């Protein structure tokens, strides 16, 4: 339905798939028991200086998750498409300098995104436009 101003929502152009760890068997061969681990830490109350233990569950180092992002290009508007792909590429680059989830200042949630490329899944797209999209993804 429409919002309070009478505007109708548009469908999202980006669809992010769920990511399931793809290398758990490889990690198990290297001694990892499970895809997550529990780390024991302490927080210290700033006024009373009393330590309080806590447990943080995190994904094990070296875990790999395949990422699929679907961009819905309803009309072939080259300028808009390239701007959107550049924005996505920049966002993924910035994410690699930041973290996902909590406790990033402790080094948790760091990600590396590599081997990213664009391909046409349904319909047709001009090869030159697709090549430009891949250039943008590789550059950022």
What residue ranges belong to the model's regions?
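Small/polar/charged residue-enriched interaction surfaces, especially the RNA/DNA-contacting tracks
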Residues: 1-140
């Amino acid at each position: 339905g429409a919002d309070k101003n009478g505007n109708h929502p548009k469908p999202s152009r980006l669809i992010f798939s769920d990511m399931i760890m793809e290398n758990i068997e490889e990690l198990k061969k290297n001694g990892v028991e499970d895809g997550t681990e529990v780390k024991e830490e302490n927080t210290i109350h700033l006024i009373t200086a009393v330590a309080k233990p806590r447990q943080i569950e995190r994904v094990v180092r070296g875990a790999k998750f395949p990422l699929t992002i679907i961009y819905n290009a309803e009309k072939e508007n080259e300028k808009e498409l390239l701007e959107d792909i550049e924005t996505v590429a920049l966002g993924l680059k910035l994410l690699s300098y930041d973290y996902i989830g909590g406790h990033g200042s402790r080094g948790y949630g760091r990600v590396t995104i590599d081997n990213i490329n664009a391909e046409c899944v349904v319909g047709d797209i001009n090869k030159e436009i697709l090549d430009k999209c891949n250039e943008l993804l590789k550059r950022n």
